[in-house]
Swiss-Prot record:
GO terms for cellular component: cytosol. The gene is purH. The keyword ATP-binding does not apply. It comes from Alcanivorax borkumensis (strain ATCC 700651 / DSM 11573 / NCIMB 13689 / SK2). GO terms for molecular function: IMP cyclohydrolase activity; phosphoribosylaminoimidazolecarboxamide formyltransferase activity. Belongs to the PurH family. This is Bifunctional purine biosynthesis protein PurH.
Length: 525
């Protein structure tokens, strides 16, 4: 290891850079810098040399060309113990440390008012070139792309008499390659959606190529099954109030299935504005309720839907977890995960008595869900679609039967429809007074899903008569409505769109049922 004698600093994000540069200068490191970074360090009274002075070549083209020079890249790429003579012949001094972060391309294009010209001017050229050069030559050169690593570098230099350890240089190089890969991916994704037409530049719905960039959050003991290896990765800028940003306060490490099921429960409960509880088992809601009396009552009602399936389930709330609700849960059932926007200290003291209960807080839920894309891996390919954010209001429903729903039925219809969206297809949901009465999930036959919902309700001792029924897709035959009438369903919400809609509507009219069409399907596979 050789000492760090010369460092080149050129950063867009100047967080902590003055302090870091001062610490390097105090260690006797010669500093080179460019543009705004040079000015900031100079104003702070730090001894620093401008790169243009070092190269003898001025910055030009409004800053587009600053560091693209052999004296810079030769100093970074020069192999110690091999290229010294070439460097000396060309008056190239070795650069031992490169500190660079890049123009804020992602933040720039995230602005809806960003023009193509703005995007182009925020494509960094010299920065990534220096980063890659330093990372390539990590055997001799340190590369820092993250302000969070400044102290690591200083501590390592202090521990190694002014040099950087091989391990740290290699780790920083990996991080640098990840940094430039993510940067180039963002650029490719942005331009990959652009298409030039008669009216100028417009966006494609989907880019020509997709470059995904996720960071590993944790390794897991195993995947969906014990023989599968697994890890959890998150987006670089995940949506707030999501499983990716949730903070675990208590309990053992989350499993692969815990994360998948908690995501399903959390996204479902976000759909309700009144106090709500969602209980999920194997990615399906097995009990959901809304109560103006608060989340304790909502939990009581959700649990009552299917007490057997709730065992070992995931419970999500859209309000702060309080002591009364926490006590009701631990007294009544075994639970894998509880997630809520926040939790009281009293609630946490209660759940802490059950050491295996995982408690997560996700922050306040602003809006229903973040937009974006959904991905499904298939052998040799990737299916990509918009996230299913579709939701209907009462005014958008089409009454297709002679009888219209009552006000109470309408509330229950919209409630049941929100739940059905998160039930695996074929999905049937029975609900009454904004409580699920029975849930039929994942059957190949819609009629069988309806039968299962009725069996679940009977087993739970809940009254189906007078309940509403939600179906995630249309009824292809009238038998689904005939069976619903037999168990006492009073009202139905479904997308409509079958070639036999008239027969289905006639069946509802014959039974005196009300039925509304949403015009929107919610398949979930």
């Amino acid at each position: 290891m050789s000492n760090v004698e010369r460092a080149l600093i050129s950063v867009s994000d100047k967080t902590g850079i003055v302090e870091f540069a001062q610490a390097l200068a105090d260690k006797g490191v010669e500093l080179l810098s460019t543009g705004g970074t040079f000015k900031k360090l100079q104003e702070a009274g730090i001894a620093v040399r401008e790169v243009s002075d070092y190269t003898g070549f001025p910055e030009m083209m409004a800053g587009r060309v600053k560091t693209l020079h052999p004296k810079v890249h030769g100093g970074i790429l020069g192999r110690r113990g091999q290229d010294e003579q070439v460097m000396a012949d060309n008056d190239i001094s070795p650069i031992d440390l490169v500190v660079v972060n890049l123009y804020p391309f992602e933040a720039t294009v995230a602005n809806p008012d960003c023009s193509l010209e703005d995007a182009i001017e925020n494509i960094d050229i010299g920065g990534p070139t220096m980063v890659r050069s330093a990372a390539k030559n990590n055997a001799s050169v340190g590369i820092v792309t993250d302000a969070a690593d400044y102290q690591r570098v200083l501590d390592d230099m202090a521990a190694n008499n002014g040099a950087l350890s091989d391990d740290l240089r290699f780790d920083l190089a990996i991080k640098a390659f990840e940094h430039t890969a993510a940067y180039d991916s963002a650029i490719a994704n942005y331009f990959g959606k652009k298409v030039e037409g008669q009216d100028g530049m417009s966006n494609l719905d989907f880019p020509r190529t997709i470059n995904l960039n996720f960071e590993k959050t944790q390794n897991m003991r195993y995947g969906e099954n014990p023989h599968q290896k697994a890890a959890f990765y998150t987006e670089r800028n995940p949506a707030p109030a999501s499983i990716a940003t949730a903070k675990q306060l208590q309990g053992k490490e989350l499993s692969y299935n815990n994360i998948a099921d908690t995501d399903a429960a959390l996204e479902c409960v976000k759909g309700f504005t009144k106090p709500a509880c969602v209980i999920v088992k194997h990615a399906n809601p097995c009990g959901v309720a809304v109560s103006l009396d608060g989340i304790t009552t909502a939990y009581d009602l959700a649990f009552a839907t299917d007490t057997e399936s709730a065992f070992g389930g995931i419970i999500a709330f859209n309000r702060k977890l309080d002591a009364a609700t926490a006590q009701a849960i631990v007294d009544r059932q075994f639970v894998e995960v509880i997630i809520a926007p926040s939790a009281t200290e009293e609630a946490l003291a209660i759940t802490a008595a059950k050491k295996n209960v995982r408690v997560l807080v996700c922050g306040e839920m602003e809006g229903v869900a973040a937009s974006g894309l959904d991905y499904k891996r298939v052998n040799g390919g990737l299916l990509v679609q918009d996230r299913d954010l579709g939701m209907i209001t009462e005014g958008e429903l089409k009454v297709v039967t002679k009888r219209a729903p009552t006000e109470a039925e309408m509330h229950d219809l919209i409630f049941a429809w929100k739940v059905a969206k998160f039930v695996k297809s074929n999905a049937i949901v029975y609900a009454k007074d904004r409580q699920t009465v029975g849930v039929g999930a994942g059957q190949m036959s819609r009629v069988n899903s309806a039968r299962i919902a009725a069996i679940k309700a009977e087993h739970a001792g809940l009254q189906v008569k007078g309940s509403v029924m939600a179906s995630d897709a249309f009824f292809p035959f009238r038998d689904g409505i005939d069976n619903a009438a037999k168990v006492g369903i009073s009202c139905v919400i479904q997308p409509g769109g079958s070639i036999r809609d008239e027969e289905v509507i006639a069946a509802a009219d014959e039974a005196g049922m009300a039925m509304v069409f949403t015009g929107m399907r919610h398949f979930r596979h």
